[in-house]
Amino acid sequence: VETPPPLPAAYDELSAASSGCPPLPPISGFVGRGDGVLLYDAFAPYRATGTNLYYLQQLLAYAQQDGNPRLAAAVGEVLDDLVCLSLPVARIWGFNDSPDRSSIRKGPDDFQEAGLRGLDQAVWEAKRRGIRLIVPLANNWADYGGLPAYAAWASKRDGVVYTRDDFFSDATMKQWWKDYAALLAERVNTFTGVRYRDEPTILAWEVANELRCQTCRGTTRLTDTVRELAAFLRRVMPNHLIADGGEGFDDQAGLYVGLSNSYPVRGDEGTSFSALAALPELDMVSYHYYPKSYGLESPRDTAVWIQRHQAIATALGKVAYLGECGYIGADSERAASFDAWLGHLFEVEGGQLGLMWQLLPSARASNDAFSVYSRKDRATAWILSRWGRDLR
């Protein structure tokens, strides 16, 4: 990695609006899809890098409930950092099915206005800075409730034990997902005054974050569920791009010749990227990259993983995007890895969008080994900024 030059002096101030950081272009229209290409204003290719900020809704719900300006400032800080780093896309959770006081939903019909207002403000804070959002509507994991919360609601309803994998065969659980999507589509944001279905700040909706189904005995059930939910989402959110939100696991190992480990592509997790990419109901298909977690630590694995996902989607007229990528290690090592990964992504046909995991405000404690503090991790910040500037 090259020696990072100083970032703008204004970068160390809280507000990009009052600093010397050049602003991002204002959001004035929807991002769409051509034949395997993201398009802005119907004709200009859209290329960008960004980050995951999954926690925005929760922090802003807390800030509103407590009248806590420090929490609101922490959100402002990290979003201003995106502006200064020229990162115009963030991926944030659009769900919160936990029992926490920041919850959006505590039961099938128990929606929480306080939680929804947290999401409202997250959209507004991003919009006024020119940051577009990718928003999953559920979670495979128990964090923020997720499919385990759906299973718990169903267990309480029927008096039997359900697991998250039952979501893929239970019509009522899937209807609960649809109920939330429909509610959100028609909701008028209390900060922007715009219905969610009409909000161009939303780049794409994801069906869910990292769906898996180890007990599904094949990948058909998960694929069919994504098809059903994506079709519904397209009806209620007709202006937006629709994506799956998955990790890119597949059941067609022959499409990924050269990987050092077949685990992510032999169907063990019940998902098939290639089948999802073929769904007409989806505009975009996501894949994630965590080399250690996926057992892909050979030097060649990165290129194969990224290039093959992009090629599969492009051949089917879809947009593939790197929805998450994370590295555990020193700042300089992470910077070199991100630089190499983004290099592979943006050099291939169809490579248009890559998001790292995860950027945190300086006051928030890290909850995993992948966290990046842009004001401390200067090598990583510089690499992200360089890519952001180059893609503008």
Spans of model-derived segments:
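Short, solvent-exposed turn/loop segments enriched in Gly/Ser/Thr/Pro and often Arg
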Residues: 52-55, 90-98, 136-145, 208-211, ...
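N-terminal carbohydrate-binding accessory modules
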Residues: 4-109, 124-132, 182, 231-234, ...
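The substrate-binding groove and active-site-proximal loops of carbohydrate-active enzymes
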Residues: 57-71, 100-117, 161-177, 205-220, ...
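Aromatic-lined substrate-binding rim segments of carbohydrate-active enzymes
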Residues: 62-155, 219-243, 306-313, 338-346
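Aromatic- and acidic-residue-enriched segments that line the glycan-binding/catalytic groove
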Residues: 102-114, 128, 138-171, 175, ...
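Active-site groove signature of glycoside hydrolases
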Residues: 92-96, 134-217
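Extracellular glycoside hydrolase catalytic/binding regions
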Residues: 179-190, 204, 208-352, 361, ...
